């Protein structure tokens, strides 16, 4: 069973194509990657993301497998009306589905909006580290500074005219790549809880 399109059943990360607006984490969190990577139990079921890739997603523009954006749909309907279904299926596997550069203008507008952003560093506080069924992730506490991120996210959503359904802000630390044996589920919970105790109320900077 494959749990996520981003990882295979051997714990190796696969190519996964799309466009996303992210905020990179500036802190060195290599110890988290190592904790998962070298933990005898966690490493049997989870593949850690490289600490250099840790980030918070601000807005998901589009990725393989998601419904097409209006820009992509309109291009297909105008240029390939009789191949619509076939191309929609093709978009789920094809690298970057941008036929005729149909979403370039949208990407430029989003990029411009991001460049106009004036906030400097944003400091967030960790609420908890938890296992949500497919990933180990960090959730953040509600601070007034999140209003800046929410406002930016709303502007990006308005430009795309598409709600991405992302949910709450989080940092993904690793993905599950195989089923957890029943006798080790409690051990997994304990090992994740150790990480939770180490990180709760710690801060990091975007």
Regions found by a protein language model. Give the residues of each.
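Histidine-dependent nucleotide/RNA phosphoesterase domain, centered on the 2H-phosphoesterase fold
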Residues: 1-206
